[in-house]
Each structure stands twice: as structure tokens, then as C-alpha cells.
Amino acid sequence: MFTFILMFYIGYGIDFNTWVANNNKHFTAVESLRRRAIFNMNARIVAENNRKETFKLSVDGPFAAMTNEEYNSLLKLKRSGEEKGEVRYLNIQAPKAVDWRKKGKVTPIRDQGNCGSCYTFGSIAALEGRLLIEKGGDSETLDLSEEHMVQCTREDGNNGCNGGLGSNVYNYIMENGIAKESDYPYTGSDSTCRSDVKAFAKIKSYNRVARNNEVELKAAISQGLVDVSIDASSVQFQLYKSGAYTDKQCKNNYFALNHEVCAVGYGVVDGKECWIVRNSWGTGWGEKGYINMVIEGNTCGVATDPLYPTGVEYL
């Protein structure tokens, strides 16, 4: 038994060195010992989960050497009150499955880094997708500026790298438009708003999907990408690798939502109907940046507060 445990730790210790190299991490000797211990702790969580669940966890991802508390400090979606906005009932028959990636209407996965700017990435991913669907363009080259929204939406209620809401991003874009990434590149840190950038795209408004209504959310996704918010606080989400994700620990009430992402489709995974959700933590997390979240029971709140831009246009 001792030999097995020793081999287990040595094995994951070797993996820790690989993880450090793959993720370009640089630790002092003391910090490296601490991170290795956390990595080994997470490796035990992975092994236990993967014996019990059909969805898989991994220590390959960017948060493998973080405690769950450290990881949670990165989740900075701000909820200050019940949001208002038009709820549009589409009342259409949605197809059984939709995946906008297969239609070339989803831009590449982005990485928000250590900046609490998920609210910009979720909302802008939905906008980019809707532009491609409604106005055309190249999904590989279309890249709107998250930096523009991080630095310039404070007067709309956001707080830079310390969190915000996608609805505030849409309010800003309605009035001022949004620049291209090449004109206002992402830094992952707080700075002042530049007034010299040219807007590249704009929206007329945005709609909310009826809360906790999975039929209406499917209808909305069948017409384009949708900005959604979730409770991403559990260690299972932190270490997610693949499969149909369900989580008994996560919550789905409005004030528990702490991370903004983007739904790009839905379909069946491992025999379970799932939302296809795009994250903003790079391609090293999850299924090359995506997670399949089980629809039944509103897993982690995907259907709690969805919204999407309308009247999208290039300028």
C-alpha cells in the first residue's frame, strides 16, 4: 500500500514539472513546494471524480496548482441587483441540436488571463457570433476588443479587471460602438480609457431570454450565440476536462452566478442533453476551451440570465 501511494505521488510530482513547463510557470523554490502540494491534492480530487463520474477532470488545465479558494478569487462577475431588460419570447420550434462552431460562426477561444473580465469575453463572443451569422465575415479574423470594454465601461457600471456585467458592455456598445482588437489590444490589466479609437461594430439593443426557460434558450441559440452566466465556483469546474458536466454543488439562482460565458449550441453528449458553452480561459482548459453542461436541472444556472445583442452591424 505504501509503495502504491508513493508511486502515486511521484507520478503526479513528475506531472507537476510537466505542468509547470506547459503553462510557462515560474516559481521560487519555496513556492514550488507549495504549488506541488496543491497540485497533488487536486490530482487526488481528479482521480476520485474520474472513478465515480462520467465527465472527466484533469490536472492538465491552467488552475491545477491553485486551491479552490484562489481559483474563486478570479471569478468576478458582479451582481448588485435584479437586472431589467426586455424579455422576448421567440415561440419557435428549435432544432434538436445546434453547433455554431460547425457552421464557422464562432471565433477562436480567447484567454482573459488573471483579469476579472469574463463579462467582456462572454458578451463579445455572442456579439462576434451574431455579426458572423447576420452580417458575414471570417470567423478566424473577426476579433473585437475586450480591452476597449474593460477600460471604458466604468461609467456604465463595470469595474475593469475587478468585474462587471455583459449588459453594461452592451449598453456601452449601443451608444459608442466597439473597436477591433488590433486597434485596442488586450493587456489583462487596468488602465485608463482611450478616446482615440475608432468603432468597428455596434448594436441597436439586446434582449433577455425568459429566465429558467430552457425551451426559449434553445430557440435563442438556434438563431445565434447567447451570453450566459453561471456558478463556476466548484473544484470540478476548475479542473474540468471533458464529458457531460453536472454538479450537485453549484447553484443556479441569480445571485450565485459568478462567471460570464457564451452558449454556442446544444446537443447530446454521453447520452445527456447538454449546452455547448464557450469559456475564456484559453484552449488548455476543458475541451479545447469548451464545456458541455447538462441541460436538465439548469446546471450551474446556464438558463438563469441569458441575453444576446440585437441589431448588430459593422461600421
Swiss-Prot record:
Known EC number: 3.4.22.-
Recorded family membership: Belongs to the peptidase C1 family.
Keyword Disulfide bond: yes
Cysteines joined through disulfide linkages: C115-C161, C152-C193
EC main group: hydrolase
Description of activity control: Inhibited by cysteine protease inhibitors ICP1 and ICP2.
Keyword entries, A-Z: Disulfide bond, Hydrolase, Lysosome, Protease, Signal, Thiol protease, Zymogen
Organism from which the protein derives: Entamoeba histolytica (strain ATCC 30459 / HM-1:IMSS / ABRM)
Classification via Gene3D superfamilies: Cysteine proteinases (3.90.70.10)
Annotated active site: C118, H259, N279
Function of the molecule: Cysteine protease which degrades matrix proteins such as collagen, laminin and fibronectin and thus is involved in the destruction of human tissue. Can abolish adhesion. May play an important role in pathogenicity.
GO terms assigned for molecular function: cysteine-type endopeptidase activity
Keyword Ribosomal protein: no
Lineage: Eukaryota, Amoebozoa, Evosea, Archamoebae, Mastigamoebida
SMART domains: Inhibitor_I29, Pept_C1
Residues cleaved off as propeptide: 14-93
Name of this chain's protein: Cysteine proteinase 1
Assigned GO CC terms: extracellular space; lysosome
Signal sequence segment: 1-13
The encoding gene: CP1
